[in-house]
């Protein structure tokens, strides 16, 4: 095994979207070192933080069509019944919404909460208020996905925050996603909302820590014992 392979297998993987930012932080750190050496070391610490921010580790995803898995690392900021954003086309009936807030220290790779087919992708320009606030669901810049699942259509909404200024979504309409599969990323602090139809019961509470691709945030009916499968 080569040295590069050893390092790659030892360290937490970094998503390719972070390579450019890590390189910029590193080069700037070297440049600052010519001005004053302590600045270089501060820059290296920030470079390490940048790499940590874009971390993309493997996750053990429970595989069960009745389970809803957290789409993001972070803290559950809301569990409520609300009307979904109109651009999702999910109607005006209230749905269960579970929100996960990601601060700048959480990983920001987003994963599908259930297996299904992407029926709609809808982007909406907006503000950049604190993503922890309830009004962020309606006022902030956001990108929504509608997934056709065994239990009907669900909504997954990427919401920009105070610092976040770039929402990335790699999937496309008509694509099939598996539970826990990566579909997007939001840079530097943000939030994910999951909208679920009748029959879904929350399995998390406000303030609880959630792990993308692993934490069960809701379920339909009585889920059977989940099969554990490693995701790439």
UniProtKB/Swiss-Prot annotation:
Membrane topology annotation: Peripheral membrane protein
Keywords: Cell membrane, Decarboxylase, Lipid biosynthesis, Lipid metabolism, Lyase, Membrane, Phospholipid biosynthesis, Phospholipid metabolism, Pyruvate, Zymogen
Subcellular location: Cell membrane
Gene Ontology molecular function: any one: phosphatidylserine decarboxylase activity
Pfam families according to UniProt: PS_Dcarbxylase
Pathway participation: Phospholipid metabolism; phosphatidylethanolamine biosynthesis; phosphatidylethanolamine from CDP-diacylglycerol: step 2/2
GO biological process, one term: phosphatidylethanolamine biosynthetic process
List of residues that carry Pyruvic acid (Ser): 190
Post-translational modification: Is synthesized initially as an inactive proenzyme. Formation of the active enzyme involves a self-maturation process in which the active site pyruvoyl group is generated from an internal serine residue via an autocatalytic post-translational modification. Two non-identical subunits are generated from the proenzyme in this reaction, and the pyruvate is formed at the N-terminus of the alpha chain, which is derived from the carboxyl end of the proenzyme.
Site (Cleavage (non-hydrolytic)): 189-190
Top-rank lineage group of the source organism: Bacteria
GO terms under cellular component: plasma membrane
Active site: 190
Disulfide bonding pattern of the chain: none
Cofactor-binding details, from the entry: Binds 1 pyruvoyl group covalently per subunit.
Catalytic reaction(s) noted: a 1,2-diacyl-sn-glycero-3-phospho-L-serine + H(+) = a 1,2-diacyl-sn-glycero-3-phosphoethanolamine + CO2
EC numbers on record: 4.1.1.65
Family: Belongs to the phosphatidylserine decarboxylase family. PSD-A subfamily.
Family annotation (HAMAP family): PS_decarb_PSD_A
Subunit structure: Heterodimer of a large membrane-associated beta subunit and a small pyruvoyl-containing alpha subunit.
Record function comment: Catalyzes the formation of phosphatidylethanolamine (PtdEtn) from phosphatidylserine (PtdSer).
Protein name from the UniProt record: Phosphatidylserine decarboxylase proenzyme
Species of the source: Sinorhizobium medicae (strain WSM419)
Source organism phylogeny: Bacteria, Pseudomonadati, Pseudomonadota, Alphaproteobacteria, Hyphomicrobiales
Protein encoded by which gene: psd
